[in-house]
């Protein structure tokens, strides 16, 4: 939901503590921690020259400001060349196996979904939390929500990471949740920004100019 906005320098803790949870969770909620599942951008796949450094700055800013409250859990990207079928533009109905093959780049994020599933289930069965809130619209996470509801006592909320009327919640994901937040508003994003300079133990982290 941050694509194309000026709100990438997002304060996740403020967003959830001040906006998302008070307006969405069915019961009074105490925010005990945030786990941010991500993967470092590969330089050769970056969309801009400063993408890698900007992401690293953001992760460092979160660590500096919320060392106890936010845990950044990293996966990784793989980038390979693979053969892929090309749609025949002159005959879009042409059968898949009859279409020509070409070599393309395939960029995949690894481990993030697995990490999310394991952390959510671990925190639920060890009674570390009474409620798990998952931010996604990915159907791959639907089994996680279903398992949490079937085999643990935690309340499960789902927040769809989109601005209003951009994407609709996936039914396979939300049907198992206790509650769903369908979007995040521009006002909430704007009101949840880190300061331009985030102080650290050794040196400050400065918001990227492109952000």
Q: PLM features: residue spans?
A:
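Domain-level signal for Mg2+-assisted phosphodiester chemistry and nucleotide/NA-binding surfaces
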Residues: 1-92, 97, 101-106, 151, ...
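Nuclease catalytic cores that cleave nucleic-acid phosphodiester bonds
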Residues: 76-211
């Amino acid at each position: 939901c941050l694509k194309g906005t000026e709100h990438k320098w997002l304060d996740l803790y403020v967003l959830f503590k001040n906006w998302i949870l008070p307006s969405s969770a069915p019961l009074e909620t105490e925010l005990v921690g945030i786990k941010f599942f991500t993967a470092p951008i590969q330089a050769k796949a970056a969309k801009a020259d400063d993408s890698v450094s900007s992401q690293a700055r953001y992760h460092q800013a979160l660590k500096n400001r919320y060392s106890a409250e936010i845990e950044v859990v990293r996966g990784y990207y793989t980038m390979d060349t693979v053969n892929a079928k090309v749609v025949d533009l002159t005959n879009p109905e042409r059968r898949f196996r009859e279409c020509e093959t070409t070599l393309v780049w395939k960029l995949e994020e690894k481990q993030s979904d697995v990490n999310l599933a394991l952390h959510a289930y671990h925190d639920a069965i060890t009674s570390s939390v009474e409620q798990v809130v998952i931010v996604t619209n990915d159907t791959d996470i639907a089994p996680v929500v279903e398992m949490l509801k079937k085999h643990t006592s935690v309340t499960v909320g789902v927040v769809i990471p989109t601005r209003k009327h951009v994407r609709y919640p996936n039914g396979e994901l939300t049907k198992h949740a206790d509650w769903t937040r369908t979007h995040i508003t521009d006002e909430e994003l704007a009101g949840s920004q880190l300061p331009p300079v985030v102080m650290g133990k050794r040196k400050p982290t400065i918001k990227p100019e492109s952000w």
